[in-house]
């Protein structure tokens, strides 16, 4: 049986696994490893510790579809809309720039529901808290080691983690990647930011006319979302679910600070924008070290083949 490993349980990894299952008709074993404790990657949805049905998107807030990708990826959008995974964004987002021909969507069940859908379609065996440390070439197969020291062999490995993490891998991969590819990977850069989710008591109201707002005059906060209102999932069972995204400069400056200190700073700034908020019943602070790509690998749009036989691919 042909064995495939996909590293990374975000959108790229889950969709890649689903497409492999669809396109490969031969017997196929699909494994998906992620070093995190949950799936989603930059499409993470957090649950309230008091009520798991109360959720907040800490990563991507909505999906923007340009006319180009509406045509190129039409089947994907139609499929997700047909299954109720995506819905048109109808709630007001103050300060959002809407370009001609663009469409915006939200995931009513949380943005991680997109990843869950594709993982289910893929039939992949998912392993969390499994961090790849080495990739070696053994008898024309990839021997992949994780941080506990255990190894498994695969016929094909697809890496979907951030480029700096690939450059940190040990083993034969160090010498198998060409110097040109290494330079391309090293040139990839990312923005960094924090997200703070605040879960409030059921029955509490945040009386503002918007579901989300871009902030332009605060050194700390760039975006605020009343997440349940944005996704049209407000209910008497859950209180408001407030999500705050910081500015990139704030994220870079405080990247190595403790989450407790960062959360306190964000909360102080939030009070200046939405004064009088009661204490939340729970919070979740999330560091996005690799938030968005600001500089992609030159001449390798979308993917890079690191080794041909057997295949080792970076997407």
Swiss-Prot record:
Organism: Rattus norvegicus
Leader sequence segment: 1-17
UniProt-annotated location(s): Secreted
Similarity-based family: Belongs to the renalase family.
Pfam families according to UniProt: Amino_oxidase, NAD_binding_8
Cellular component GO terms, alphabetical: extracellular region; extracellular space
Main location: secreted
Catalytic activities: 1,2-dihydro-beta-NAD + O2 + H(+) = H2O2 + NAD(+); 1,2-dihydro-beta-NADP + O2 + H(+) = H2O2 + NADP(+); 1,6-dihydro-beta-NADP + O2 + H(+) = H2O2 + NADP(+); 1,6-dihydro-beta-NAD + O2 + H(+) = H2O2 + NAD(+)
Cofactor requirement: FAD
Molecular function terms from GO: epinephrine binding; monoamine oxidase activity; NADH binding; oxidoreductase activity; oxidoreductase activity, acting on NAD(P)H
SUPFAM superfamilies associated with the record: FAD/NAD(P)-binding domain
Enzyme Commission (EC) number: 1.6.3.5
Gene Ontology terms describing biological process: cardiac left ventricle morphogenesis; dopamine metabolic process; epinephrine metabolic process; heart contraction; negative regulation of blood pressure; negative regulation of heart rate; norepinephrine metabolic process; phosphate ion homeostasis
Name of this protein: Renalase
Binding-site list for FAD: 12, 42, 61-62
Sorted UniProt keywords: FAD, Flavoprotein, NAD, NADP, Oxidoreductase, Secreted, Signal
Keyword NAD: yes
Enzyme class of the recorded protein, top EC level: oxidoreductase
Function of the molecule: Catalyzes the oxidation of the less abundant 1,2-dihydro-beta-NAD(P) and 1,6-dihydro-beta-NAD(P) to form beta-NAD(P)(+). The enzyme hormone is secreted by the kidney, and circulates in blood and modulates cardiac function and systemic blood pressure. Lowers blood pressure in vivo by decreasing cardiac contractility and heart rate and preventing a compensatory increase in peripheral vascular tone, suggesting a causal link to the increased plasma catecholamine and heightened cardiovascular risk.
Record-linked InterPro entries: Amino_oxidase, FAD/NAD-bd_sf, RNLS
